[in-house]
Regions:
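Extended acidic/polar, glycine-enriched regions
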Residues: 1-27
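Extracytoplasmic/cell-surface-exposed regions of Actinobacterial cell-envelope-associated
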Residues: 1-10, 40-41, 81, 217
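Compositionally biased low-complexity segments at domain edges in trafficked proteins
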Residues: 22-49
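Generic structural motif
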Residues: 4, 15-19, 39-44, 210
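Substrate-binding/active-site clefts of carbohydrate-active enzymes
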Residues: 42-219
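Generic structural detector for well-ordered beta-strands
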Residues: 11-15, 35, 206
Length: 219
């Protein structure tokens, strides 16, 4: 680029990818993606449906309860998924959701580093990804940087008072999603959708806090 009559050249090398590196091409328009909810898909290990220390127990008679699907069930059906022509499988979040109710969907995370034991273990997830890859199927990891679960340990002692939007007090959004893309939307609607919580069980992370932003980037 040029600046005040000066020219500066910045050089950087394009190196050969290291064997076995994790830097791979992502998904795109060429892919056929299967989006599924693991708890509702297939139960390959009934022994982990309900576990000590996890208050939301399996109950197939309850529409909002857990139904027992897990990584073992997903792994058992990879041949079927590949045979249907899918090139990518996108499970909803698999991280721990130790919420009192409605933990099946995975979007109220209480441990950002641990697969929910009712789905399996971190090692089970690695094996699932490897098994999918062996069949030519990629795995999209669903992560949730917008919010956490209300039972997350942070909610017992927030790192900073403004770690959560509205200082940890539930403030629902009106879900005016188009306010973010509508050039004529009212500022109050943009603010409401940006800072409001989806539901009381999903405290909204304040990404304007530089420590929150740094945590999300690094982790």
């Amino acid at each position: 680029f040029e600046r005040a009559g000066e020219t500066e050249t910045i050089r950087y090398p394009l190196r050969q990818r290291a064997p076995g590196s994790a830097a791979r091409r992502g998904f795109g328009p060429r892919d056929v993606i299967l989006n599924l909810m693991p708890d509702r898909y297939a139960d390959g290990d009934p022994a982990n449906d309900s576990l000590p220390g996890y208050t939301d127990r399996a109950d197939r008679a309850e529409p909002g309860g857990r139904h027992g699907g897990d990584l073992a069930g997903l792994s058992e059906r990879l041949d079927y998924i590949a045979g249907m022509g899918y090139t990518m499988v996108w499970p909803t979040p698999l991280m721990e959701n130790n919420q009192p109710t409605h933990s099946y969907h995975g979007y109220a995370v209480t441990d950002l580093y641990r697969v929910d034991p009712r789905f399996g273990s971190n090692d089970d997830y690695r094996r699932f990804v490897a098994a999918a890859r062996a069949r030519g199927v990629g795995v999209i990891q669903d992560i949730v940087p917008n919010h956490i679960g209300s039972a997350h340990p942070w909610m017992q002692d927030l790192p900073t008072p403004d770690w959560i939007n509205n200082r940890g007090v539930f403030q629902p959004t009106r879900h005016a999603r188009n306010a973010l893309s509508d050039p004529y939307a009212a500022a109050v609607d943009r603010e409401d959708f940006t800072r409001g919580w989806f539901v009381a069980s999903m405290p909204d992370l304040n990404q304007r806090n530089p420590y929150v932003a740094n945590f999300l980037i690094q982790h």
